[in-house]
């Protein structure tokens, strides 16, 4: 009976998308709950429907379910405690349970080892608190990264629109030049072609810059998403794994976010046809 209740409890705290214990859980309008990151990625390229019942959702910005988050934390803490009291986690020197975490070296210590000369000057905390702190650090990093992904998408959309407008502008300007020559200078066909060539050269110069700018934004978008997915996988790990040294991942995430390719806005005045239009 107790085993069945425990299994049912864990099932309720399992994300239907990733099938891991809920991380930063959110509950949508139909009542189903998911990891925030799983829902972000699920809705990114498709209409906002519940992945379970397919009910449409008008809302996309959800607050974390505090109750579910606390319950999920209890499940993770229970798994961590099971490891902490295991024979595998006993100090080989003092035969004590290693219930203290050294923040400096990212290792588990027993009470006596934490007070040794080697570790006395390091920052220590209970392993459970260290795990919770690492999870919060991870969730903040993911939130920041997701905001950067959305910002980058807006820049990409703006660049696509600008390329289309620029191509249209080139066509319209060329038509205007030809119309002006036909109306006012019908005999100057050579000058007309030179004028058109000048226009195309200048216009294509900016068009190429726009396309390169778009390619840079697309590449940044790919890197941001790959980093987000890497952090998401990390967030689904048990606390025992989460307490390993992940500083390199955080450094890479922060470095990627420093890259800020902006949509290019060329000077439309660069296509003015002096002395003619």
Predicted regions and their residues:
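RING-family zinc-binding modules in ubiquitin-system proteins
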Residues: 1-277
């Amino acid at each position: 009976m107790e085993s069945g209740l425990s299994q049912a409890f864990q099932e309720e705290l399992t994300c239907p998308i990733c099938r891991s214990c809920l991380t930063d859980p959110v509950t949508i309008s139909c009542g189903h709950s998911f990891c925030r990151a799983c829902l972000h990625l699920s809705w990114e390229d498709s209409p906002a429907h519940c992945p379970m019942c397919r009910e449409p959702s008008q809302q996309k910005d959800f607050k974390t379910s505090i109750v579910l988050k606390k319950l999920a934390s209890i499940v993770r803490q229970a798994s961590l405690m099971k490891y902490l009291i295991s024979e595998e986690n006993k100090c080989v020197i003092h035969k004590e349970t290693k219930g203290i975490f050294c923040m400096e070296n990212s290792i588990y210590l027993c009470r006596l080892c934490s007070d040794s000369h080697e570790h006395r000057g390091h920052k220590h905390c209970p392993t459970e608190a260290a795990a919770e702190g690492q999870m919060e650090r991870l969730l903040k990093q993911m939130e920041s990264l997701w905001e950067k992904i959305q910002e980058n998408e807006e820049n990409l959309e703006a660049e696509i629109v600008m390329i289309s407008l620029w191509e249209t502008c080139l066509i319209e300007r060329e038509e205007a030049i030809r119309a002006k020559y036909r109306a006012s200078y019908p005999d100057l066909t050579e000058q007309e072609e030179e004028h058109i060539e000048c226009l195309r050269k200048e216009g294509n110069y900016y068009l190429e810059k726009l396309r390169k700018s778009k390619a840079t934004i697309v590449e940044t978008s790919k890197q941001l998403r790959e980093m987000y997915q890497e952090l998401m996988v990390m967030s689904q790990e048990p606390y025992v794994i989460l307490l390993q040294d992940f500083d390199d991942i955080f450094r890479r995430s922060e470095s990627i976010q420093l890259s800020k390719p902006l949509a290019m806005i060329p000077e439309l005045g660069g296509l003015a046809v002096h002395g003619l239009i």
